[in-house]
C-alpha cells in the first residue's frame, strides 16, 4: 500500500512542494527569504482580517476606528502594530529576496522571475492602499500626490485620475475602493505566489555556485524545513521587538493627525520602503518623465535576463561584478535617504546623481563588466 502522503491527490501536491522536493545541498541562508515572505503574507492576511472586523471605511470614522482598535479592542494595539510593522518586514525580505536573485543569477529562470516582478508590483500597490486607510494626514496627502501622478498620462490622464478617485478629489469614494482593493489584493498575491512556486518547481532551485545541481540533491524535509523554522524564529523575534518596544519607529508622526484637506504637511513622503522610488520620481523636473522613471526603476528588473552577458550564472566567482552589485546596494540606500529629505540643495543634486547612477549601473556597467570578465577568463 502506498503512503497517503504520496498518493492522496491534495496531500501529494504539498508533498512534492515542501517534503520530498529535491533541493540543492548547498543553498545558503539567502534562500530562506522565500519561506519568510510566505510567513509574512500569511501573517498580514491574518492580522488584516482581524483589523477589518473593527475598521470602518468612511472618511468621518476611519481615523476613530483605528484609535478604537488600539484602545478598546482586546490586543487591538498588538494586531495593528503587527500589521504595520509586518509590512516593513515584508519589504525588507522582498528586497533581500530580489537582491539574492540578482547576485546569484536566479533571474535566468525567466518565468519565475517575471511573475516575481509582477508580485512586487502587486505588493507595492497593496501597501500603498493600506497606508491610506488610517486616514491620517500622510495617508490623505500621500494618496493625493501618488494618484495625481497618473494625470501625467497623455490624453486620458485627468479623466483616469477622477475615475480612480470616484470624484473630483480624494474623498469617501476613494477610501472605500482602496479598502476593497486592499482587502482583495493579498488573496490575488497568494494565487500569484502559487504560480511563482509552480514555475520554480519546473526547474528546481538555483544554488550559490550557479551550476546545475541535479547530481547533488537532498529532500527538502527535514533539512530545509528546520532551517526555515530557524529563519522564522529570527523574524518573529525582530518583528515582536519592533512591535513591543518601538512600534512607531518606521511610521510617520503626521499620520497621528486626522486627514485635513485644507492643511498640507511640510514634507509629504511615503513609507520608508518606497523612498528609493520616490527619490527617482522627484529627481526629474518633468511630471511625465518622473512617472516614467518611477515605473521603469522597478520594471528594469525584467531586463536582467536580457542584459545578462556573463558566461557564468552566479556572481560568486566574479569579483568585479560583486563590486558593482554592492555599489548598486549603496546607491539604493542613498536614494532611500534622499527620498526622506526635503526638496532643497544639496539633496536634489545628490538624488539626481544617484538616480542616474542607478540606471547607468544596471543598463551599462553591469553587462559590460560581465563581458570584460569573460575576456579576462579567455571565454
UniProtKB/Swiss-Prot annotation:
The keyword Transport applies. One of its GO terms (molecular function) is ubiquinol-cytochrome-c reductase activity. It comes from Ctenomys pearsoni. Belongs to the cytochrome b family. One of its GO terms (biological process) is mitochondrial electron transport, ubiquinol to cytochrome c. Binds 2 heme b groups non-covalently. It is found in: Mitochondrion inner membrane. GO terms for cellular component: mitochondrial inner membrane; respiratory chain complex III. Coiled coil: none annotated. Heme b b562 binds at residues 83, 182. PANTHER family: CYTOCHROME B (PTHR19271:SF16). This is Cytochrome b. Component of the ubiquinol-cytochrome c reductase complex (complex III or cytochrome b-c1 complex) that is part of the mitochondrial respiratory chain. The b-c1 complex mediates electron transfer from ubiquinol to cytochrome c. Contributes to the generation of a proton gradient across the mitochondrial membrane that is then used for ATP synthesis.
